[in-house]
Design a protein with these regions (language model features):
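Internal, well-ordered domain-core segments that constitute the primary functional module
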Residues: 179-181, 191, 200-201, 217, ...
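Short alpha-helical segments and helix-capping/turn motifs at coil-helix boundaries
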Residues: 176-179, 186-190, 244-252
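Conserved catalytic cores of phosphodiester-cleaving nucleases, focusing on short active-site segments
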Residues: 176, 192-194, 201-209
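A structural signal for short, well-ordered beta-strand segments and their strand-loop junctions
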Residues: 184-185, 193, 202-203, 263-266
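Acidic-basic catalytic patches of nuclease active cores, encompassing PD-(D/E)XK
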Residues: 149-184
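Conserved short loop/turn motifs at secondary-structure junctions
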Residues: 158-161, 189-193
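Short, well-ordered loop/turn elements at secondary-structure boundaries
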Residues: 177-179, 187-189, 196-199, 257-260
Length: 459
């Protein structure tokens, strides 16, 4: 038995945690047997102030679940010795002895091809085949065992045209598990029905996708760029959101939601790197206001409508009929494959030759001395590097919501609130990046990958 870091335990087995148990016990250390066939956990009882241990083995669907436990041990050392003995005992048993008897179906495998090679999405092939993305691949391979394919087409879409959208759903699953929520596995709609010590949230994921049959409008001149950002992109985001708002079966009326705040999680994939600008553009669209600086003063404009060619959409998503049933809109321009790669390396996954360096620009308002945005640079490969799944998340709160989402239900995110005069109040975490890119080095070749876009060969 050897000790492992918490991020690795979380990646391998964190999805099986019952959130309520953490109000009774505190996790103290994490362990694994040779080859990680078994995992171990030592906990401290918050009430009795003694220690316990848990052994986890893979069930018939290859998910780590508890197979043995004990409590009321007087010290950490006693719990560790008892856990070591238990892991040695269970390590001698066959895999079948770890099965629970309640499993249905076979283990989920996102990477076993279910379509011809010609149909595989380029981003899926990058994840599945490129050594420099092996940390992300191994991380997703650990996560996939806990995924419930309620609509029956997740794997096919993940491998083909829906790769980006499905990765966005996996990001949300990882982020809200990290925060301390558990997913209701029998809920078909919306995408995630979550409960935990912080309350309940229902989330439907949506994406702005590439236009069908036509190209994205050119935006090379200043005039074209201004029109593209002020109107074309907001219209794309508007249609992604209103598609969910006007769903034939309103999500907020689903039995599984049952009065929980209903949130739409939006990502922009309409063009390569489109999510780079999603936060300011989506903020303007959902609130229906635009801020600018004129002669050193903030000018607030009520937008009214977005118009681009024959395309028109009213601005102010939260002002639309029935939008009062949407508690908030969630964004994260950094919730992409590159984050999966970094989080995988933090957990010790992937080819050990892979090295990553992350640099970018972060918000500075939390710094009373110098509130300006600041540059950062971090070596992801160093043991002291930390990053959370929720980092980079922005929550746009609906001022008209019938069921408001409380900010403390999504801690460590950036929360934005529209004020009656059109100003926007920001509640910021200690570190909130605007954007970043990650340089991935393998065998002397470096690839610099924006969190929000595709790879570019550096050197």
């Amino acid at each position: 038995m050897h000790e492992i870091i918490k991020p690795r335990f979380d990646a391998l087995a964190g999805y099986v945690r019952a959130p309520q148990i953490l109000s009774l016990v505190q996790e103290a250390a994490w362990f694994a047997s040779d080859g990680e066939r078994l995992l171990g956990l030592i906990v401290w009882d918050r009430i009795d102030h003694d220690f316990g241990w848990v052994v986890l083995g893979r069930d018939r669907k290859a998910r780590f679940r508890a197979i043995a436990q004990d409590a009321s041990l007087p010290s950490f050392a006693a719990a560790r010795d008892a856990l070591d003995t238990a892991i040695d005992l269970y390590h001698r048993q066959p895999d079948e002895d770890y099965h629970q008897g309640d499993e249905r179906g076979r283990p989920i495998d996102f990477f076993a091809p279910v379509v011809p090679a010609a149909r595989l999405n380029p981003n899926f092939r990058t994840l599945a085949e490129q050594p420099r993305y092996s940390p992300a691949r191994d991380l997703v391979a650990a996560m996939m065992r806990f995924h419930e394919d309620t609509d029956g087409n997740f794997i096919e879409q993940f491998q083909t045209t829906g790769c980006d959208a499905r990765l966005w759903e996996l990001y949300l699953y990882a982020a809200f598990t990290e925060i301390g929520y558990a997913m209701r596995p029998d809920a078909v709609i919306p995408d995630l029905v979550l409960s935990g010590r912080l309350g309940r949230i229902a989330i439907e994921a949506t994406t702005a996708n590439p236009p069908q049959g036509v190209a994205v409008p050119p935006h090379r001149t200043r005039q074209e760029i201004d029109a593209y950002l002020a109107d074309y992109v907001p219209i794309k985001l508007a249609r992604a959101l209103t598609r969910k708002l006007n769903h034939p079966q309103p999500y907020w009326q689903a039995d599984s939601v049952d009065g929980a705040p209903f949130v739409i999680a939006l990502q922009d994939f309409h063009a390569p790197g489109a999510m780079t600008r999603i936060v300011p553009i989506a903020t303007e669209y959902v609130f229906g206001v635009r801020h600018s600086i004129v002669e050193g003063a903030i000018q607030i404009e009520r937008i009214g409508e977005h118009s681009f060619g024959r395309m028109r959409e009213p601005s102010g998503f939260f002002d639309l009929p029935n939008a009062e049933n949407v508690s908030a809109v969630i964004l994260n321009p950094l919730g992409t494959l590159t984050k999966f790669n970094r989080m995988g390396q933090i957990a010790g996954f992937g080819d050990p030759r892979v090295r990553m360096v992350r640099q970018g620009l972060a918000r500075g308002e939390s710094n009373d001395v110098d509130p300006r945005p600041f540059n950062f640079r971090h070596d992801v490969s160093k043991p002291e590097y930390t990053e959370s799944w929720v980092e980079g998340m922005v929550v746009l709160h609906n001022p008209r919501a019938l069921i408001p989402l409380e900010p403390d239900q999504i801690p460590y995110a950036n929360h934005e609130f529209l004020q009656p005069d059109g100003r926007i109040m920001s509640l910021l975490p200690e570190f909130q990046p605007y954007m970043s890119n990650t340089s991935i080095t393998l065998d002397g070749t470096t690839e610099t990958v924006p969190d929000e876009g595709g790879p570019e060969i550096d050197a």
